[in-house]
């Protein structure tokens, strides 16, 4: 197993000063900027965007 550079192996939480370990809105241990597309629209839906405060990709409320 490779060690995740964002993760404190003792606590399984982000290393001090880092924001996140993984997720569609996490890159190199930091949250992606608000407004970054994390899921492109399919069909008649709308794109989903990162919030800048979580590693998750929330569903667009207009979908």
From Swiss-Prot:
Identification of the protein by name: Disintegrin schistatin-like subunit B
Cystine residue pairs: 6-29, 20-26, 25-50, 38-57
Motif Cell attachment site mapped to chain: 42-44
Pfam families documented for this protein: Disintegrin
Keyword Disulfide bond in annotation: yes
InterPro entries according to UniProt: Disintegrin_CS, Disintegrin_dom, Disintegrin_dom_sf
Secreted keyword on record: yes
The species this protein was found in: Echis carinatus
Tissue expression profile of the protein: Expressed by the venom gland.
Sorted UniProt keywords: Cell adhesion impairing toxin, Disulfide bond, Hemostasis impairing toxin, Platelet aggregation inhibiting toxin, Secreted, Toxin
Primary location: secreted
Family designation: Belongs to the disintegrin family. Dimeric disintegrin subfamily.
Domain Disintegrin stretches: 1-63
